[in-house]
Amino acid sequence: MDKNVIEVKQLSKSFRKTVALQGCDFSVRKGEIFGFLGPSGAGKTTTIKLLTGQLKSDGGDIQILGEKPFSSKIKSQIGIMSDNSGLYEKMSVYDNLLLFAKIYDIDKSCIEKVLEEVDLLDAKKQLVSQLSKGMKQRLIFARTIIHSPSLLFLDEPTANLDPSTANEVREIIKKLNAKGTTVFLTTHNMEEADEMCHRVAFLNHGHIIESGHPEDLKLKYSKKQIRMKTSQEDYTIPLDPKLLKQELEHIDELLMIHSIEPTLKEVFLTLTKEES
C-alpha cells in the first residue's frame, strides 16, 4: 500500500470571485481508503470533480494512475459513484446493468457476478421502482463497479441515508477495498471516516489543514477524558492521574467511571480553532 495512485500538487480552483480550493497537496496510496473530510462548502465535491475530469483546475497538477484526470487511458480503470438519477425505474435490476455493460463493452456474464457482490442477485428481475432505498444504493454501486475499476471515487456515499442503509453502503465499500480496490471518498461524517479510512485529510475553506492516519491525528490533537457519575452529578475531566486521584478522594458515592475515546470531530474542531 505504498504506491501512490493519486498525486495532487498545489491544486487551485475558483468560481468567479469565490475560492473553492487553494494550494492543495495530497496523495492517495494504492489499496487504501482515503477520506476527504470537511463541512458543506469546504471544497470536497469540487475536489472530486477535478480529480475525475468533470472540472478543470485553475492551477496545480493532478495525476491519476500516472495520467491526467481527463485521459481516455484511465477511463476503464476508475469508477465514479453518482446519485440514483441514472437508474431506470421502469427497467429491471438486470437490464439496468446490461446498459452499462454495453457502455463499457464488457460481456454480460459479469452482471450476475457484480450483483452477487452487492447482494442483489435474488432481485435481478425486480423493477428498480420496487426496490428499497438501500437496494437502490447497492444497485448504484453495482453500476459503478461493473467494469471492475481499480480506483473508486465516492462523493458523500452515505449522505441523506438512514442508518441501516448507510451501514449497508459502508460494508460494501470495505468489502471492495478488502479485494484491493483503492477508494477516495468525501464525507462530512467524522465517525464514518474514523471507521473506514486508512488516512484522512481535513479540508476547511478550500485549504487542507491536516492529514494523516485517524489514530495518529487523535493522539496528536485530542486528549482522553474520564466520565464520572456520582449521586449528585455527571461530568468529565481530563485523563490526568493526579486530577483523578483528587476527584476520587472527594467523592462519597461513585456510580460510574469510564474513559471517553477522542474523536476525529474533536480533532477537526481543534484544528479549526487553531486556524482562526
What are these regions (language model features)?
Residues G60-S76:
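Conserved ABC transporter NBD signature motif
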Residues L98, K102, K108-K124:
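Conserved ABC ATPase "signature" region
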Residues F141:
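Hydrophobic anchor residue at the start of the ABC signature
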